[in-house]
């Protein structure tokens, strides 16, 4: 039990240190790349098209590298509960710098206690947005269908803007 508590505390401390480091680097914002509204909109539109082609109704949330909502799209008829989940998926992808599916795998295997960290989603549909240098620019979260379909829509959005992510 004590070992699980130590691991959980380690995860919480890691999340806090990551947040503090993000704040410390915020003053250098003008020097680092960022996610533009144009790119976020194009990403959401591509994810929207994929969902329409698949015959599913979803919410699409795109956040910047600080986890702040940058662009949001709700398809007509998408389930109400999926609104917040889409935003939490996008946030998780940024905060953990991994897809939400990968975060789920970590919570099962490597790091007991991560499931206790608030606002982290541990199933598919959230993907970090990275530029060609691997820098985190934001996250996309899709929710309203199965985790596999949500992830496919998020990936379609990301794939559509690869050339815009410098």
What positions do the PLM features span?
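N-terminal secretory signal peptides that target proteins for export/translocation
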Residues: 1-8
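Bacterial N-terminal signal peptides
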Residues: 10-23
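Flexible, solvent-exposed loop/hinge segments and secondary-structure transition points
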Residues: 27-166
């Amino acid at each position: 039990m004590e070992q699980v508590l130590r691991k959980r505390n380690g995860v919480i401390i890691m999340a806090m240190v990551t947040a503090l480091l993000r704040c410390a680097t915020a003053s250098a914002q003008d020097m680092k790349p960022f996610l533009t509204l144009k790119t976020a909109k194009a990403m959401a539109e591509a994810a929207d098209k994929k969902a329409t082609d698949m015959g599913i109704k979803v919410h699409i949330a795109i956040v910047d590298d600080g986890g702040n909502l940058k662009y949001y799209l709700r398809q007509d008829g998408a389930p109400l509960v999926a609104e917040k989940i889409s935003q939490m998926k996008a946030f998780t992808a940024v905060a953990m710098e991994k897809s939400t599916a990968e975060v789920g795998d970590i919570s099962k295997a490597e790091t007991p206690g991560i499931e206790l960290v608030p606002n982290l989603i541990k199933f598919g549909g959230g993907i970090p947005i990275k530029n060609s240098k691997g820098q985190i620019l934001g996250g996309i979260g899709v929710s309203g269908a199965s985790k596999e379909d949500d992830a496919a829509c998020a990936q379609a959005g990301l794939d559509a803007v690869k050339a815009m992510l410098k």
